[in-house]
């Protein structure tokens, strides 16, 4: 989400639900190691008296699927989740920056840091619900030390 919105109750509710044991267990059960949960972190879901809608951009899989699972849980706390799927990695960030999305869910921290630096945007991460493992496969390089950070 855009910097400065981290403490909004609906954003905190979204973060808490994504990090809940329920969602973390669902990730583990549904992605068979292709997507790995980060581990439950019991964040408090704030009281939200008036219904609110959060518009969140996400890649179709696994991010939008995880949000679809989280949506009914959020609804129990007066938060309606509107999920907007994107098939590129630029529009979700520009939409958060211009305010047409409240948040997005699709990227890792190094990508976000580079995007902010290159585009002059002000997007921050609140939680990391999962990671997607990557493999290194043999090819022409015999020693991994040739790769820099």
Each model region followed by its residue ranges:
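Beta->alpha turn/N-cap motifs
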Residues: 1, 60-61, 87-89, 99-100, ...
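Periplasmic-binding protein-like
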Residues: 18-39
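Ligand-binding "clamshell"
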Residues: 1, 114-126, 141
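Short amphipathic alpha-helical coupling segments at ligand-binding clamshell hinges
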Residues: 6-17, 148-149
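Short helix-initiation/N-cap motifs at beta->coil->alpha
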Residues: 83-94
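A conserved helix-loop-strand patch within extracytoplasmic ligand-binding domains
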Residues: 4, 21, 126-149
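Immediate post-signal peptide segment of exported/extracytoplasmic ligand-binding proteins
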Residues: 40-55, 74-75, 143-149
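Short, well-ordered beta-strand elements
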Residues: 49-61, 79-85
């Amino acid at each position: 989400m855009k910097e400065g919105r981290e403490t909004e109750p609906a954003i905190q509710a979204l973060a808490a639900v994504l990090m809940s044991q329920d969602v973390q267990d669902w990730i583990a059960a549904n992605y068979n190691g292709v997507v790995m949960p980060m581990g439950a972190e019991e964040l408090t879901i704030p009281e939200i008296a008036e219904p609110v809608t959060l518009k969140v951009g996400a890649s179709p899989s696994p991010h939008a699927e995880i949000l679809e699972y989280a949506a009914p849980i959020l609804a129990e706390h007066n938060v309606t989740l509107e999920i907007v799927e994107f098939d590129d990695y630029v529009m979700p960030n520009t939409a958060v920056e211009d305010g047409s999305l409240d948040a997005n869910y699709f990227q890792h921290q190094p990508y976000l840091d580079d995007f902010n630096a290159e585009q002059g945007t002000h997007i921050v991460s609140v939680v990391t619900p999962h990671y997607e493992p990557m493999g290194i496969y043999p090819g022409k390089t015999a020693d991994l030390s040739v790769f820099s950070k």
